[in-house]
Amino acid sequence: MSSVNLMEWSALKTQLQAGRDAGKARVSIGPADTARITRMTYADNHLIVFMNARLAKENHRLYQFYAEVRCDLYSYKSCYGTHASATCHRNCTSYKTFVMPGLRDVHTDKLHVVKFKRSDEKRDKNCLDGYLADVNRVHMQTSLLEGQYVRFKNAHACRDYRLSHTAKDVHEFESMLERVQVSALSHEILPVVACYDIETHSDGQRFSAPDADFIISIAVVVRRDAADTRICLFYSPDDPVDLSSSSSSPPAAPDTAAVHFRAERDMIAAFFQLLPLLNADVVLDFNGDKFDLPFLTGRANKLCGPAEAARATKIARYDLSPVNVVTQQSYDKFSNKLHSHYLTYYIHIDLYQFLSTDSEHNDLENFQLNTVAEHYLKKSKVDLPIHDMLQMYGEKRLSRIVEYNVQDCVLPVELFLKLEIADYMYTQCMLLYLCTDDLLRNISHKITVAYFHLALTNTVAAADPTPDPYFFNKYDLSVTSGRKRAFNEPAPSANAIDLSQLKRTPVDAARIPPSAVKLCSTRQSCTYKGGKVLSPKPGFNRWVATLDFNALYPTIMMWEGVCMSNVFIASDGNVYLDKNVNAVNPKLLKTLSEMRVRYKGLRDQCEYNSFYYKLYDKIQNALKRIANSIYGYYGIFFKPLANYITKMGRGKLKEVVGKVEAMSDDPRILREFGLSKINFSVIYGDTDSCFIRVLFDEAELAPDRRQTAIRSIVQDHVCKTLNDSWCGYKMSLENIMLSLILLKKKKYCYLNNEQRTKYKGWLIKRDMPLFMRKAFRATVDSLLRGHSTACALGLLAEQMLRYYREFGAPRENLVDYCFSMSYNETSTTAKRRKEEDPARKPVITIAKHCRELLANPGVDFLPGNGDRIQYVLVDVKEKITQKAFPLKLFDPDSPTLQISWLKHMNILCTFMNELIQVFGNRPEFEHYFGAIVDEYTSAQMYDVRYPVLVPTRRAKAGKSAKKNDSDSDSDSDDDDDPATTPVNYHSLFSMHLKKPKRQAVGEFEPCPQCVARA
């Protein structure tokens, strides 16, 4: 908690301006000072380079400055001349087309391209690279890169934060600099980070809207060299206001400067004036693209009118000309609109959008700030319900509102640093020629930008600098993805492709190389086929080793020459892949792989958690994420090539199974470890990994030697034999599982060699209430550690009954009992149904139903597209959708609205059935399941159901049973399920309306593990 100091706006502005004026004095930047380019922006044929430097003579003080230099950029457009003569009057250049150009040394299709200087009147007119930002072009056409560390070769002076130099253009400016390697750094230079957040008023009956509701406060927090500046602007038309804290504890955080405004329009204008005074490099918000920025500009328009609002909300920095906020419209996977906001002189990152669209963060329960902060920072927000905030504001007690507002800015700043977003962003800039504004762009845009430049600068081979350029016409991808159509044509089939639309000259079938691979025909329907999944053998296993391929798909793409420039159409009507490993994509992947190996090696030479260790680790992790994302590009734009990659992966996994199982009873292993027998059995495999059960006579190895021996056997014999048989491909030992519960594909859990339980695809789904997940995991953990099923189920019953009795006390724990569902205005399912039956009523999902309920009474956060809405079921006589009730509005003490445990018990039923499938039918399942259900339904009036054991029927050969369980996965992987799978159970539970008669059960046998401990 921080103390709040009330200040006048003029006093705060003077204080901040004084700090800025102190830095206007002459500062010398010399060869001993390392600088980092934090951002670049381009306008009117001039490049503005924002830099942060560590001043060696001033104890490495952080100094921010900028340089401005003339910079001519160039674009490309098609030349439609006849080219009858040897030269073109437009001075065009002929490039091989990057997408399916033909076959090297036989025939390649050409594209005639004119390179022209960009100007304001010719910016994107008929431009083939119109999707590039100007800073992308700077990265491609100069040696300057955002995120780059540099030094000036000679000393230069800075006055008013502006670098004085004599460079006439950007190329002279480049010659003034030398690049600094990361290994030469003594201090990391991070951008100065700011975050803002607004709190809005409402009538308590609906969500805030800028046309009707005002802004209560705007908080800003700036982190510069680990020190915070905290400011909160608040609006209250009347005096006085109470900013005294109700807490008696001393403040643990820096003071917050609070400024009282009696006019809301003045407060909004002051916020935009703060940006240049605070001079951050990065401006964060949390859901700002959808809420905060539109609300700020909406209120400014409402209060001032469009003309005055445009002036008040301009973005300024240093003495540069103020500019408008730039918006760009994009779409998510559900075709919902999203407006991104760009602040020109600052890097703007909506942290909510970053987290919710990055697959690295899929394990989060939801993307609300409190959830994210608890997951990554082990911190939580200040709790302030909307109705309490409105009451406090009405009573002019603003201290908690200020504290709440400021904390909502502190957490995103800490998340930005914790998740190392700056390093990931700058690594993308340096490797893929992206700009900092591309951070939130989708993967297809990012890879397209990289391919555009790499195609133009391609060479014959990595070791041969002879130019071999291609031109990447992005619009060819509309054909390869099957999306091209005329404006008056209906949308094509999702899987149909017609590559004849590219109008490529077919290669004579007689000239096709023997090594070329047939991918598809020029016209066909192509569906995506995923990686191989070896049919799991369900059950409980001990001593299981997992082997993983190192970067399987990137390795396949490197060694198979996977690249759009290697694909060609032949005269036999088929499409082929020429395995040229010197193509653009294989060389990119090889570069990424070699860089990652180098940085991992440098990291491992450093002391753990030291400055260099963390620096190298951040870079190698960013390289890994970039390389792994490239495969998905082909799944979007050319499925036949993606299918070839997965086909090769399936073949490799199948090869592993044969080689591993052939090593059973290897004489070398038996002799070295003194064993009479050893059997390797692959019990499961998924895409790039396989599970190997190691069977041996445990009596022949001392208990303290077993784990070490298994590790040595698998690592030094199994892995080595596999890797020695390949060229380029490599497998590594990922883990030794002391015990494993394998349920079905992509669903298992295990006890690792550090005695920690890990879950994959099982008991992790976000829709399962947290209290059930905790109870289920405690049960499974006891089973993995050798406890009996009766002992584990007794623990389950004990915990489930305790959670039932604790429901609603305290109120903050309600979130542990709820479900959640993603909200989308337009889902793909609803779209498909609409196409099938236009007269059909729109589908109202649980999420839509709950959002409508939330919008009416007013809440502090109204879920948008992609947000997960938390809800419970209430005990009313309705269908499931109508039973759903938003958690934010649910009161556990309400006499009229009680919770329904219907869905909770259905989830418990699924869990019990999963355990039966592993451990077989036992009387303890029926006993404990019945006891739990009886307690939970004791006060429920409607939809009470009881567990009944129903005999199972074997699935017919070739058909897989469809089951609607809580953890089911939908995927398109190639499944090796056999026609029949042996089972060790004869019946499973089903929930019925009629309560069954239960047989009395005596005491269960004592748990051997518990007896041994006692």
Swiss-Prot record:
Annotated function: Replicates the viral genome, host DNA polymerases cannot substitute for the viral enzyme in this process.
Molecular function via GO: DNA binding; DNA-directed DNA polymerase activity; nucleotide binding
Enzyme Commission code: 2.7.7.7
Disordered: annotated segments: 956-983
Extent of Acidic residues compositional bias: 967-978
Organism: Lymantria dispar multicapsid nuclear polyhedrosis virus
Family per similarity comment: Belongs to the DNA polymerase type-B family.
Key words, A-Z: DNA replication, DNA-binding, DNA-directed DNA polymerase, Nucleotidyltransferase, Transferase, Viral DNA replication
GO terms for biological process, alphabetical: DNA-templated DNA replication; viral DNA genome replication; viral genome replication
Catalytic reaction equation(s): DNA(n) + a 2'-deoxyribonucleoside 5'-triphosphate = DNA(n+1) + diphosphate
Protein's name according to its UniProt entry: DNA polymerase
InterPro entries per the UniProt record, alphabetical: DNA-dir_DNA_pol_B, DNA-dir_DNA_pol_B_CS, DNA-dir_DNA_pol_B_exonuc, DNA-dir_DNA_pol_B_multi_dom, DNA/RNA_pol_sf, DNA_pol_B_thumb, DNA_pol_palm_dom_sf, DNA_pol_type-B
SUPFAM superfamilies recorded: DNA/RNA polymerases, Ribonuclease H-like
UniProt-listed Gene3D superfamilies: DNA polymerase family B, C-terminal domain, Helix hairpin bin, Palm domain of DNA polymerase, Ribonuclease H-like superfamily/Ribonuclease H
Disulphide connectivity of cysteines: none
